[in-house]
Amino acid sequence: MAMKKLLIASLLLSSATVYGADGFVVKDIHFDGLQRVAVGAALLSMPVRVGDTVSDEDLSNTIRALFATGNFEDVQVLRDGNTLIVQVKERPTIASITFSGNKAVKEDMLKQNLEASGVRVGEALDRTTVSTIEKGLEDFYYSVGKYSASVKAVVTPLPRNRVDLKLVFTEGVSAKIQQINVVGNKAFSSDELISRFQLRDDVPWWNVVGDRKYQKQKLAGDLETLRSFYLDRGYARFNIDSTQVSLTPDKKGIYITVNITEGEQYKLSGVAVSGNLAGHSAEIEGLSKVKPGELYNGAKVTRTEDDIKKLLGRYGYAYPRVQTQTEIDDANKTVKLHINVDAGNRYYVRKVRFEGNDTSKDAVLRREMRQMEGAWLGSDLVEQGKDRLNRIGYFETVDTDTVRVPGSADQVDVVYKVKERNTGTLNFGVGYGTESGVSFQAGITQENWLGTGNTVGISGTKNDYQTYAEFSLTDPYFTVDGVSLGGRLFYNNFKADDADLSDYTNKSYGLDGTLGFPVNENNTLRVGLGYVHNSLSNMQPQVAMWRYLRSVGMNPSLSSNEDFSTDDFTFNYGWTYNTLDRGFFPTAGNRTNLNGKVTIPGSDNAFYKATLDTQQYVPLDQDHSWVLLGRGRVGYADGLSGKELPFYENFYAGGSSTVRGFRSNTIGPKAAYYNNGSSNCSGSDVAKICSSDDAVGGNAMAVASAELITPTPFLSEKYANSVRTSLFVDAGTVWDTHWDDTAATLGAGVPDYSKPGNIRMSAGLALQWMSPLGPLVFSYAQPFKKYDGDKAEQFQFNIGKTW
């Protein structure tokens, strides 16, 4: 024991050796061992100065002060007469930092953590800090189930008291959950409870959410899910007594045991609201989601608290406090809720500010605002502004923040933080298709031209059956009241016979203009005028086509092709109802469009045409990761004043935007030709009718789709807002209400195309990607209900189309 005490004393003396117990006056200070640290910097860190009278305690404080700088591994203070000699050993300087073997932890994250701990190139190496970092990283690996992981800091000495620091990772494998046990449950089976966990001991192949890899954070979330499950079903005394996580000897397997006490179900005996209600007591009391006599429900209590905060927020109370205390009567198995409300101060809005809009001008964002500066704060108005910014589609994300104004008790700034997305689409391509042959396409569309909010588009397509060019321009705020103005010029040379449609060629050009009038937050009315010139040629004698020509006063030959041209002026109208939460990749809300046109006097044709589209997004979970999408489209058109609808105005279905899995525009009525020499013909030589597989379209259409939008497997959260996957079922039909089912067409095997019941159906999966070149859509679908003459196309790819 005496030897041990002597050893401890000698160790203490080794760091500070001073001769003489009495104080003395310091006349000089010398340093021995300084290399990187300047003498002046070392002197400034010492509490002792030349001329001071110092004691042993002062010298001990000097040693502690020098150690505290982090620059020294060893410090000794010696006395030579009235001179202090400070002998130091500097910590080595870090020359470089490298990493090896790290896969689960990215280098950027490691560098940030090292920087935060003061470990960086050019600084002194603190071995204690490095040891702490080693342990912290190992603890992180343990928290994600990698119990065999290790992290070692390798320090390599270099000349001039420098070192290389290398962190060597051995990550190992993640421990798999072998079994999860819930002990103490009586009302619900263990399988039912565990099915609500993210962590699983058995994961079916189709479950993209469940995970057998242990993670401490996920377990904590699952325990909270378990707690909420019971509290939402009346078990007010539910408790998680303990949780055991056991590791197998090889550190590759984990057993989890959760011990619970369910308790009994409790009913509500009453709800009492008190506190500073800011004069809105009647409204607040009416918000309660819980009623006496029903089972206690924790989720309803939380929703009630949130609704009270939202209500007060609408009246300018930006920071209300709402707390609910439960008064539990164990004898009667009842719970009384005491909701205490403190509305706090009412706030004005000093400024509305925007952050992150590097391209979009402030005015483009500000015109979407409903919260005015200088007015009372209204949380609903702030939220409306957020919804409108999301809906215009210029931003990936929009977040809001209400910030108190320093020095003011009743003013706040409302800050909208946006992350802009690429709103321009530039594409140029050369391709080859079995239908189109060699294809050239080019286009540029900018939805937010120069940050003004205007949309400008120029596009063109050239292939075996079409030459198309278009220029369009839309100003969504032509007036300050939100009246929009849009216009379009186009040219189209279309050879229908080369596109699996009935035989004709149409060279058309035209223009149109549209004014849009906002009716309210969600409704817009559009009106406009249009003009189009159609020059039709090489029209092969065909039953539906010839029926139209006769209606406009022509007497076409049954044995030769015809040419025809028209000039039409139209009144265009439309209505849009939009409650979608975002302009692209929405997850909630509805968008319904009604579009139509009718010819006006001066036109060669007389007809009307209308289409109704609707999309409904229903989120299935709180995070909007799973969303049900229902889509529908119906269209109808007909002639006026005894004239028929022009055949080139018919509806078509099939393709990536209607019924996937079928070739574009091939669903519906097929052409029946006169005297085309086909083997499928019937009738006399003069009026012989021949069936075909060429699509001709119809004057009525109905399309529907049910789609389940799912989280994209194996995709980083970073890309969650730019990639979408879904499973779908599509259905659709096109028919001709004026089809004349004659004996001749029956003899040629031509079906009755006036029936709407010939519905085609398909099922498949789709992937959408908001790429730097614009939206890309891939789909694979398998038709499971089709008819003779239909043309399948399982894999389809489209650029620049989203829904």
Curated annotation (Swiss-Prot):
Name the InterPro entries on file: Bac_surfAg_D15 (IPR000184), BamA/TamA_POTRA (IPR010827), D15-like (IPR039910), OM_assembly_BamA (IPR023707), POTRA (IPR034746)
> Can you name a GO cellular component term?
Bam protein complex
Signal peptide as annotated in the record: 1-20
Provide the GO biological process annotations: Gram-negative-bacterium-type cell outer membrane assembly; protein insertion into membrane
Keywords for this entry?
Cell outer membrane, Membrane, Repeat, Signal, Transmembrane, Transmembrane beta strand
Q: How does it assemble?
A: Part of the Bam complex, which is composed of the outer membrane protein BamA, and four lipoproteins BamB, BamC, BamD and BamE.
Please report the name of this protein according to its UniProt entry.
Outer membrane protein assembly factor BamA
Q: Which organism is it from?
A: Erwinia tasmaniensis (strain DSM 17950 / CFBP 7177 / CIP 109463 / NCPPB 4357 / Et1/99)
The gene from which this protein is expressed is: bamA
